[in-house]
């Protein structure tokens, strides 16, 4: 867990805010399964960050050489690269830390262009896509950073074909009420 500090003040994370908004999201799922899913997703995020920062000519070969990805992770990375090409995704920043005043902080996955339009993209490896959750997540990231044209989820479910899904932007008034901002 990351502790978000701003001038000595501990800030909530976007994940903590969402856990309060969706308290039953993972109800009934055993901890060991949640931990395994989190580990898998974290590794996919790390591999994507490495690909985007190192820009190897042969990304899959590079990841195989320096890491130990599973067969499923390799397939997810192939899907990532396919979607990146299909939607002309240009990654400008990855794993960018953002802070909204003294209310919250978080790490947005990808800031870039999708078909030449500015976007925030969250990468998910979940079995089912929860677009409402991702809408709130990306809207909070956008409010902490700067406006973009569109918000997306790059969904890479384990063992299945990936998708780039546009998600709705949540109204700023709703977000400010959620975080307790009075203005």
Regions found by a protein language model. Give the residues of each.
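Nucleic-acid nuclease catalytic cores
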Residues: 96-180
């Amino acid at each position: 867990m990351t502790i978000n500090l701003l001038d000595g003040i501990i800030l909530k994370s976007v994940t903590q805010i969402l856990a309060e908004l969706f308290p039953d999201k993972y109800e009934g799922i055993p901890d060991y399964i949640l931990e395994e899913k989190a580990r898998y997703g974290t590794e996919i995020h790390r591999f994507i960050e490495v690909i985007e920062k190192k820009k190897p000519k042969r990304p899959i070969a590079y990841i195989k050489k320096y890491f130990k990805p599973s067969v499923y992770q390799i397939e997810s990375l192939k899907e990532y690269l396919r979607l990146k090409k299909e939607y002309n995704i240009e990654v400008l920043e990855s794993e960018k830390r953002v802070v909204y005043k003294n209310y919250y902080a978080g790490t947005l996955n990808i800031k870039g262009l999708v078909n030449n339009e500015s976007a925030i993209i969250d990468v998910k490896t979940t079995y089912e896509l929860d677009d409402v959750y991702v809408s709130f997540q990306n809207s909070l990231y956008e409010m902490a950073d700067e406006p973009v044209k569109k918000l997306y989820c790059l969904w890479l479910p384990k063992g299945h074909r990936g998708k780039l899904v546009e998600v709705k932007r949540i109204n700023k008034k709703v977000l400010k009420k959620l975080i307790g901002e009075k203005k």
